[in-house]
Swiss-Prot record:
Its main location: cytoplasm. Residues 289-309 are annotated as: Disordered. GO terms for molecular function: rRNA (cytosine-N4-)-methyltransferase activity. The gene is rsmH. Gene3D superfamilies: Putative methyltransferase TM0872, insert domain, Vaccinia Virus protein VP39. This is Ribosomal RNA small subunit methyltransferase H. S-adenosyl-L-methionine binds at G44, G45, H46, D62, F102, D118, Q125. InterPro entries: RsmH, SAM-dep_MeTrfase_MraW_recog, SAM-dependent_MTases_sf.
Length: 309
């Protein structure tokens, strides 16, 4: 199979069901003439809903080029004309309103009516062994959100970083109580090249009692490595600090998080930054029906804030 056909196959297989779509649309209130920013385009579900419910235009960002291509194909198949959509292969931490947004007749960047961020890893990324996000199937220790990026992979972290660096991220990003034991066991087991190798090493490192839980001992380690590789929390902090500059007065930011580290950052920023007015005192969670339909939705939390006038 040639490269073009392989890429097409990936796009056709890229199916990601967006979470809390109805709640996002309800809070962002798309209206005719409105412009919105989707900083985590993924499968295009949130953007499609906004465009179908009244939004005039959407700027979509994604670090993953496969997701970007799949979303573009999905939106085109839904009848969304190209002039209503502007897509960028971009980390949202690098977004610049003047460069990447819509412009007025004077060439100035136009602030958005609303922004949506659906954080974390998508189902297609988790389900593709070659991406290295999951230990359910053997794959390379990669974990880059953008597989084309020239950056450290999970294998680089596991095999080259000092053990103290591993302990640090396992504690900070994985909240792992056996971080030191696991890090030293990894150091003794180097080199490690695959997801299943790493999962086995973690399994051996933890006490027998810790192996009997519902959650595999490697789950937090994989989360910590993924966050470190992609600098996810740093990117989220940048988004929360910069988003008021990208919004019109009264414009809204909707953030969907999937673990407590993300949710705490969002909650703290919304409550302490005077530029935000909190619209969701408590996070919104998916209904039981949505959780049954989409297992990924179970840990999702939505917080929304408006830019102060």
């Amino acid at each position: 199979m040639d490269l073009a056909r392989a890429e097409l196959g990936e796009m056709l297989l890229y199916h990601h069901e967006s979470v809390l779509t109805e709640a996002v649309v309800a809070y962002l209130q798309p209206q005719q003439g409105g412009a919105f920013l989707d900083v985590t385009l993924g499968g295009g579900g949130h953007s499609l809903a906004l465009l179908q419910r009244g939004a005039d235009r959407v700027v979509g960002l994604d670090r993953d080029p496969t997701a970007l291509q799949a979303a573009q194909a999905r939106l085109a198949a839904a009848g969304i004309p190209g002039n209503r959509l502007q897509l960028w292969h971009l980390n949202f931490a690098d977004f610049d309103l003047q460069r990447h947004g819509f412009r007025d007749e004077r060439g100035q960047g136009i602030p958005f009516d609303g922004i949506v961020a659906d954080l974390g890893v998508s189902s297609p990324q988790l389900d593709c062994p070659e991406r290295g996000f999951s230990f359910r199937a053997e794959g390379p220790l990669d974990m880059r959100m953008d597989p084309t990026a020239d950056q450290e992979t999970a294998a680089d972290w596991v095999n080259r970083r000092p053990v103290e660096d591993l302990i640090d991220i396992f504690v900070r990003y994985g909240e792992e109580r056996f971080a030191r034991r696991i890090a030293h066991h990894i150091e003794r087991s180097r080199p490690l090249f695959t997801t299943t190798q790493l999962a086995h090493v973690v399994w051996q490192a933890v006490p027998p009692a810790a192996r009997r839980g519902r959650i595999h001992p490697a789950t937090r380690i994989f989360q910590a490595l993924r966050i470190a590789v992609n600098r996810e929390l740093e990117a989220l902090e940048t988004l929360l600090a910069q988003a008021p500059n990208w919004l019109k007065p009264g414009g809204r930011l909707a953030v969907i998080s999937f673990h407590s580290l993300e949710d705490r950052l969002v909650k703290w920023a919304f409550r302490t930054d005077p530029r935000w007015q909190v619209l969701t005192p408590k996070p919104l969670c998916p209904s039981e029906l949505e959780q049954q339909r989409n297992s990924r939705a179970r840990s999702a939390k939505l917080r929304v804030a408006a830019r102060s006038s």
